[in-house]
Amino acid sequence: ALSAARARDVPKVATGFIANVVCTETFVSGLDPARIFAETMSVMPGTGLISWALDYKVDRVRKDVTVTLLGLGKSHAVYRGEGLGCYLDHGGPVADISLPPMESKPALLPEIAGASIAAPQSAQLAAALDRAFAEADKSTPRNTRAIVVMKEGHIIAERYADGIGIDTPLPSFSMTKSI
């Protein structure tokens, strides 16, 4: 019974995840929905089996995204506004949220980074960045979007994928780590 319940949930889970990612990266990050959809599909295990059956629609006026899977699953994500991001709309009432006023603080960039993108200062670091952005195996792409390397409180190297820059907000899930 447990496996049947999980199999039954696959369409809703897949469409919900994709709807939320496409919504967030379209309306928060400002990226192209077609790129987001393709890159998301390429890194999700098992989606190659269902990608042909998935469809998405972005409504830039209403600021929402709908993803369907052959009519078996349909999910709708809505952008709530600056600082609130996107949420999955399950059809129920939506709580009215007001954010507290943001405290205006100057950016720390002048203290931790230079005036321009920090190029790696060693061949080893440059090679590591090259490897991180290389797409050696097209069947399992990395889709690396940004890497910022800090040492002793200062940015010592950074690199961004095409269409991504210093000011591009990106969702990070749990991939942002420090060693």
For each predicted feature, which ranges?
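Extracytoplasmic/secreted proteins, especially bacterial periplasmic and envelope-associated proteins
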Residues: I18, V22, Q124-A127, S174, ...
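N-terminal accessory interaction module
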Residues: P45-V94
